[in-house]
Swiss-Prot record:
This is [Ribosomal protein bS18]-alanine N-acetyltransferase. Acetylates the N-terminal alanine of ribosomal protein bS18. It comes from Haemophilus influenzae (strain ATCC 51907 / DSM 11121 / KW20 / Rd). The gene is rimI. Residues 2-146 form the N-acetyltransferase domain. The lineage of its organism: Bacteria, Pseudomonadati, Pseudomonadota, Gammaproteobacteria, Pasteurellales. It holds the Pfam family Acetyltransf_1. Its main location: cytoplasm. It is found in: Cytoplasm. It catalyses: N-terminal L-alanyl-[ribosomal protein bS18] + acetyl-CoA = N-terminal N(alpha)-acetyl-L-alanyl-[ribosomal protein bS18] + CoA + H(+). Keywords: Acyltransferase, Cytoplasm, Transferase. Disulfide bonds: none annotated. Coiled coil: none annotated. The active site is at residues 103, 114.
Length: 146
């Protein structure tokens, strides 16, 4: 059974492990810890008593930005990202948020999940993300009107 709840201080070591495995260019431990506070709605996803994913989202007035979402690679493609995003959107609506923004690598297959949930492509940021092998990759800016 899946449980989704607020991220706690004791979760960061596990979140960092997931971050390192889930992203092409992962956040540092410091960046992960610094994206916390009263303006954030940060959730963890627990399956079989183990954290397998998380979402980092900042809220400002009636808008929110999804800064990071990560699901452990062995659990990707099983609906856990959709489950976590659904809970995040539900809680954002309860807070009066009207628009959820995100940006994603052009090559990231999560774009298709975002589109299914209701996100629309708003803009392209040319050469925004660095590639581990060198060079740059475009970012796709997306918005979901709640």
């Amino acid at each position: 059974m899946s449980i989704i709840s607020q991220i706690e201080a004791c979760d960061f070591e596990r979140l960092y492990e997931i971050e390192q495995q889930a992203h092409l260019v992962p956040w540092s431990f410091g960046t992960l810890k610094n994206n916390q506070g009263e303006r954030y709605l940060n959730l963890k996803l627990i399956e079989n008593n183990q954290i397998i994913g998380f979402a980092i989202c900042q809220t400002v007035l009636d808008e929110a930005t999804l800064f990071n979402i990560a699901i452990l690679p062995t659990y990707q493609g099983c609906g856990f990202g959709k489950l976590l995003l659904g809970k995040l959107i539900f809680q954002l609506k309860e807070k009066g948020v009207q628009t959820l923004w995100l940006e994603v690598r052009e090559s990231n297959s999560a774009r298709f999940l975002y589109e299914k949930i209701g996100f629309n492509e708003v803009d392209i940021r040319k050469n925004y993300y660095p590639k581990p092998s060198g060079g740059r990759e475009n970012a796709v800016v997306m918005a979901c009107y709640l």
